[in-house]
Amino acid sequence: MRSGCRFFAMVFIALAGCRAPVEKRDTVPVVRIATVLGRITNPLAEALNKVLPDHFPARVEVQKTDLTGDYVRLIAEGNAELAMIQTDVAYAAYTQSTGDSPSPRRRLRGVAVLYTTPLHLIALQSSRIRNLMDLRGKRVVVVTIGSPTEFTARMTLEGVGLSVADVHPRQMPLEEAIRALRAGEVDAVFGRGNDPSPSIRQIMSVPGMTFIPIGRGQIDKIRAYHPFLHSTSIPAGIYGNHPEIETVGVEMLLACRDDLPVDLVYWITRTLFESLPVLADSFPPLRQIDLEHVQASPIPLHSGAARFYRERELFQ
């Protein structure tokens, strides 16, 4: 372990080179974490905001945006340094053109694969929807077109031979979806959130709601086309009296930009793992972290993160 003086000396050197990607205000470097307030990644941003300044002299700010789909753009265009991005979204943004970019976002880099977020498919019991194939011809809420939830829902449907058009998609916030479900204006809704999710709990509080499982056979078909989706489950009883529900999950990647200084990203990565118990107290999904899997990024690792993982392997 380096001495405290050397630690801070190295961090000051690292941050001194952060003119473009890390904003300076009153000579104090600012690391911006992209987030949507009230959404699933906001608690992690708040937890990092508490911990990172204790390890190096920088101020962590939340860079607010209206849509989680903006995270990639904020990082790629230099308006944020860190964000939590779904692995499927990160891979698509890095390898191909997307709706907001005519060319791949090749400046994206991975820091750590952290935890899995389940996809929730909820339907009215009266709709007689029992599996994904029963969604054909139904009115299904996909939240916002272009959002990570819609992206994962679309990949899930395509994996079993359906398209979004097959399900008569409806675009609306989850809060509006609750009203539409009550009124019988829609039959089902795709949602995404770490369990227990306040939004999912609110939907499941509506009488007559049920989770629709996505079974192993369907997940195997989905993974054949979209390997970043995998099997996970919604624990029994956390939204009322329901059994454990099989579903699709997608991993969340802490991502950054390629021009962040190597030393800065090294210390961010190191701080993340040395402070993991504290972070997990503030953001329980981090308890899922598989320390043997954290570097399995679908896009290239940032050199600073790769340096941390190499050192970790050497000193284990």
Residue ranges: model-predicted function:
Residues 80-116, 126, 194-198:
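Acidic, polar ligand-binding/catalytic clefts
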Residues 15-17:
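C-terminal motif of bacterial Sec signal peptides marking the signal peptidase cleavage site
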Residues 24-86, 101:
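N-terminal (or domain-start) structured segment
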Residues 87-89, 97-98, 163-255, 259-260:
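Pocket-lining segment of extracytoplasmic ligand-binding domains
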Residues 19-21:
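Bacterial signal peptide processing site
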Residues 2-10:
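Sec-dependent signal peptide recognition
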Residues 245-316:
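Segments of small-molecule ligand-sensing domains
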Residues 28-55, 117-183, 295, 299-304:
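Bilobed "Venus flytrap"/periplasmic-binding protein-like clamshell domains
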